């Protein structure tokens, strides 16, 4: 006999973002098991150089189609390449040009997966919900309260860092079936159900770059400007091929050889002098210039869409997969905050996102403007 929940779900249509990967495949399967009317939607977000071996779009679409056929659900396709170029890629290039290090995956979620996708699912496919294969969870409040976004159950795979721009309205319209599972369990389900994606490896790297070498890709769109590498005292110790290829705290790829009168400790990027096109490097992972006591962030997005008006104790991540850092948020205005860490941190990078948590709850975040 059908459960009450199963029967209520059968009136609801869910459009699943099918990427051709295991997480979205299992998401579609689980929603079908829960009784929803499930349809897939495959997005093509990148048009350039599809003839290169790096672009897996054709293979991904074939895998998504095979999974939908196996599950007996329709698959729609949509091309968001123009929206992606205008709203994600041009920002990505502008940030690199300005010497910052952006995170395009966060912008892709904001502008494409939870905006353009949601609008298309609403207007064309008449969706009640959309669903994605992200490792996050959400609450389902019964009494008119705003839903909250929670970290994924699998701490290793939690993707809330990439989704902090979502509003409670977007969270309310989205289901995250695999957020309640550990990754090995997701693969086990895919295998049990005979889904072609069960053993497919997870995609890595920025969506439009894929597996190729980042510097090669970037140089096609932004001309590199070589310059000097200096110590904080102004001593020239090497040359760089372009500031955009380097990020704060970076150790590899500096090609600074052994020098007289210097210790054997490795060199790290401590700063970028944009005016002079100079990279500043220091020796030793514990060098004080590598450490920040806090940061200033702007372009804030709070999941509940309520600005912070007084100091808040919470934790922050300044990059993906980082352990939580205890901190205090101090509001400077509705759209700017100062964040002071309990302990100094390395590699706090302007252009990256600072994302805030209270326990399991993702509060939101913003773009790092400067470090303190």
From Swiss-Prot:
Catalysed reactions, semicolon-separated: S-sulfanyl-L-cysteinyl-[protein] + uridine(34) in tRNA + AH2 + ATP = 2-thiouridine(34) in tRNA + L-cysteinyl-[protein] + A + AMP + diphosphate + H(+)
Residues reported to bind ATP:
17-24, 43, 133
Give the positions the UniProt entry annotates as the active site. Answer: 108 (nucleophile), 207 (cysteine persulfide intermediate)
Q: Region entry Interaction with target base in tRNA: which residue ranges? A: 103-105
Among the GO molecular function terms of this UniProt record, one is: ATP binding
Per UniProt, which keywords does this protein have? Answer: ATP-binding, Cytoplasm, Disulfide bond, Nucleotide-binding, RNA-binding, Transferase, tRNA processing, tRNA-binding
Q: Which Gene Ontology terms describe the biological processes this protein takes part in?
A: tRNA wobble position uridine thiolation
Q: What is its EC number?
A: 2.8.1.13
Where is the site labelled Interaction with tRNA? 134, 352
Gene Ontology CC annotations of this record: cytoplasm
Cysteines engaged in disulfide bonds, as pairs:
108-207
Q: Where in the cell is it found?
A: Cytoplasm
Q: Report residue spans for region: Interaction with tRNA.
A: 157-159, 319-320
Chief location of this protein?
cytoplasm
- Residue stretches spanning the membrane: none
Function as written in the Swiss-Prot or TrEMBL entry: Catalyzes the 2-thiolation of uridine at the wobble position (U34) of tRNA, leading to the formation of s(2)U34.
- Similarity section: Belongs to the MnmA/TRMU family.
Q: What is this protein called?
A: tRNA-specific 2-thiouridylase MnmA
């Amino acid at each position: 006999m059908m459960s009450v929940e199963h029967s209520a779900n059968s009136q609801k249509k869910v459009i699943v973002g099918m990427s051709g990967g295991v997480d979205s495949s299992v998401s579609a399967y689980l929603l079908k098991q829960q009784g929803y009317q499930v349809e897939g939607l495959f997005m093509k977000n990148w048009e350039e150089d599809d003839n290169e071996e790096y672009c897996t779009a054709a293979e991904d679409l074939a895998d998504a189609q095979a999974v939908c056929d196996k599950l007996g659900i329709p698959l729609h396709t949509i091309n968001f390449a123009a929206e992606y170029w205008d709203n994600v890629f041009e920002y990505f290039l502008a940030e690199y040009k300005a010497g910052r290090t952006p995170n395009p995956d966060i912008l892709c979620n904001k502008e494409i997966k939870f905006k353009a996708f949601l609008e298309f699912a609403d207007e064309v496919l008449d969706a009640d919900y959309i669903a994605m294969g992200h490792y996050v969870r959400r609450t389902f409040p019964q009494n008119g309260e705003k839903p909250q976004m929670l970290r994924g159950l699998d701490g290793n795979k939690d993707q809330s860092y990439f989704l902090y721009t979502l509003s409670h309205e977007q969270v309310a319209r989205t289901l995250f079936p695999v957020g309640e599972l550990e990754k090995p369990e997701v693969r086990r389900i895919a295998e049990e159900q005979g889904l072609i994606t069960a053993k497919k490896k997870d995609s890595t790297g920025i969506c439009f770059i894929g597996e190729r070498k980042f510097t090669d890709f970037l140089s096609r769109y932004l001309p590199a400007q070589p310059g000097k590498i200096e110590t904080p005292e102004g001593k020239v110790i090497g040359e760089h091929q372009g500031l955009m290829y380097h990020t704060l705290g970076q150790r590899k790829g500096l090609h600074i050889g052994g020098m007289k009168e210097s210790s054997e400790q490795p060199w790290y990027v401590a700063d970028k002098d944009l005016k002079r096109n100079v990279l500043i490097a220091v020796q030793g992972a514990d060098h004080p210039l590598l450490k920040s006591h806090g940061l200033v962030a702007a372009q804030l997005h709070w999941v509940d869409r309520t600005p912070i008006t007084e100091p808040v104790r919470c934790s922050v991540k300044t990059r993906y997969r980082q352990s939580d850092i205890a901190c205090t948020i101090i509001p400077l205005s509705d759209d700017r905050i100062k964040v002071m860490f309990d302990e100094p941190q390395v590699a706090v990078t302007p252009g990256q996102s600072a994302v805030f948590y209270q326990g399991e709850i993702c509060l939101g975040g913003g773009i790092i403007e400067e470090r303190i």
